[in-house]
Amino acid sequence: AKAVYGRWWVVHLWVEGFFEVFATVVAAFLFVRMRLLNEKSATLNVLFATIIFLSGGILGTFHHLYFSGTPKAIMALGASFSALEVVPLVLIGYEAYHNYRLSGKKEWVKGYKWPIYCLIAVAFWNFLGAGIFGFIINPPIALYYMQGLNTTPLHGHTALFGVYGV
């Protein structure tokens, strides 16, 4: 059980923790520079992502521990904190997309069309891969039947687009 916990500790804190914060900071910075996101919203979401990483990153690890005999209440707590990790980047992507649609007719926006689409796609894939597909495979009953099936790589690979881009 200690080896399983240690393995998922590394995976969770590196992949789901650091990458989420990094992607949120980079997207927020670029969207602020392109005037698609105001600084206050960017700052709040980056701080929210950092707080979730620091406080919930450790607790979020518990959703990986199904086969090590962890009680269901602990796994549910971990799944809840893990699900919160996608919220800041999704909020940034949503606000940037909304502002992009409002300012889409301006000339400078046309020059940045594809980078903007890429960053918005990052937020979308993060929501779909880490959020939706991750939450589908996290409940204990789902882990009992689906662990190791194609739903696990589906979650991992779609979440990968949500960090590294499309």
What are these regions (language model features)?
Residues 9, 76-79, 104, 144-146:
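Active-site-adjacent structural elements in folded domains
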Residues 39:
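Solvent-exposed interhelical
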